[in-house]
Amino acid sequence: MNSIWARLRLASSQLPIGGYSYSQGLEAALDNGWVRDAESARTWLVDQLQLNLARFEAPLLAGLLRAALIGDWAACDAASERHRASRETRELAQESRQMGFSLHQLLEALPELDAPGRAWLARQDPPNLAAAWAMAARAWRLDAEEALSAWFWSWLENQLAVLMKTLPLGQLAAQKLASSLLPELDRACAEALRRPAVEGSAAFGLALASMTHETQYSRLFRS
């Protein structure tokens, strides 16, 4: 089967894992005035890509994806635990748990994931999103680059949806922003595949946005 179908499926906004309930700190950045228009939104997103996702989140996920594809369960355990420990706020931890749980439930209901993958995922109590994403890649026969590019696209599409609802950003403006960000997305994905996973990150702006969001007076999103 052509792997493009599985990649589109994994990246799709129709994947029922609740991703569009979360803004990953962007709603708080808007409320605090750090993001005010399309230009400042682009700066925020490029910083996230270059300073956080490409250097920490995505290399960690790439390692987990590679381990999952070959069935190196000890390496999967280590990467999953590192991902769990790296969530800097309660909101971000709950987001990863809820989305991981929902993706686990989906994989349990579908036939593609093999017995070793199901057994490992069942031992994660509950699985975080990175763990479940890696098992989805195993189930749907995606290599690390394919599954990671789906993850990056899902992230970007989510952030654009947040901007359209809260800035607000029009659909055409959102597509123009997407066009300007696609080269950055490509570079971030390539860098993440080259980098080894590291022990931790220091995304202070994201952590502060997430913490202030927990006490924000009015909000649309859960993070």
From Swiss-Prot:
The keyword Cytoplasm applies. The gene is ureF. Required for maturation of urease via the functional incorporation of the urease nickel metallocenter. It is found in: Cytoplasm. GO terms for molecular function: nickel cation binding. Keywords: Chaperone, Cytoplasm, Nickel insertion. UreD, UreF and UreG form a complex that acts as a GTP-hydrolysis-dependent molecular chaperone, activating the urease apoprotein by helping to assemble the nickel containing metallocenter of UreC. The UreE protein probably delivers the nickel. Its main location: cytoplasm. Belongs to the UreF family. InterPro entries: UreF, UreF_sf. The keyword Glycoprotein does not apply. GO terms for cellular component: cytoplasm. This is Urease accessory protein UreF.
